[in-house]
């Protein structure tokens, strides 16, 4: 059986630390943040979509498929992940947040190797010091378990991942690759 993969850029948050603006559309080095993410994703995986809960028309101008969370009220990244898993035509979905334009060019390859070699359903990035759970590769078969988890009111990504025996994949050689842009000052760097 051939295992298939797709990717989703997570741009569905409220961006409270950035004053509530749509973070994925903020210009960084003369381009919206989500476009930087797509440019790094595209060489790694061909099938890419965007999870956005506002400004869908603007995101759709990129030519990429755009979808919003099925759960209303900005319930966090797991809500977008659940919606993506339920809609995916692939066996696994790679997730990348819209605010980390320097993520590793081997992100998909390393996460894919981890899930295949260890027969896992979920793998996420770890930089040697911190977990980066929004950089993850998730089996679509986990959608029912995630729906149950969210129905309890829980929203913590790492708790869900630990319950699913997720694999932390070592990216300690490139810890700065996971630096995210959290405020308007960061956009100027």
UniProtKB/Swiss-Prot annotation:
Top-level class of the enzyme under EC nomenclature: transferase
Keyword GTP-binding: yes
Cofactor list: Mg(2+)
Binding-site residues, GTP: 10-12, 23, 51, 69, 99
Pfam family, one: NTP_transf_3
Gene3D superfamilies: Spore Coat Polysaccharide Biosynthesis Protein SpsA, Chain A (3.90.550.10)
Record localization: Cytoplasm
A cellular component annotation (GO) from this entry: cytoplasm
Assigned keywords, A-Z: Cytoplasm, GTP-binding, Magnesium, Metal-binding, Molybdenum cofactor biosynthesis, Nucleotide-binding, Transferase
EC number annotated for this UniProt entry: 2.7.7.77
Record field: catalytic activity: Mo-molybdopterin + GTP + H(+) = Mo-molybdopterin guanine dinucleotide + diphosphate
Gene Ontology biological process: bis(molybdopterin guanine dinucleotide)molybdenum biosynthetic process
Assembly mode: Monomer.
Domain text: The N-terminal domain determines nucleotide recognition and specific binding, while the C-terminal domain determines the specific binding to the target protein.
Protein family membership: Belongs to the MobA family.
Matches recorded under NCBIfam families: molyb_mobA (TIGR02665)
Protein name from the UniProt record: Molybdenum cofactor guanylyltransferase
Species for this entry: Pasteurella multocida (strain Pm70)
Gene: mobA
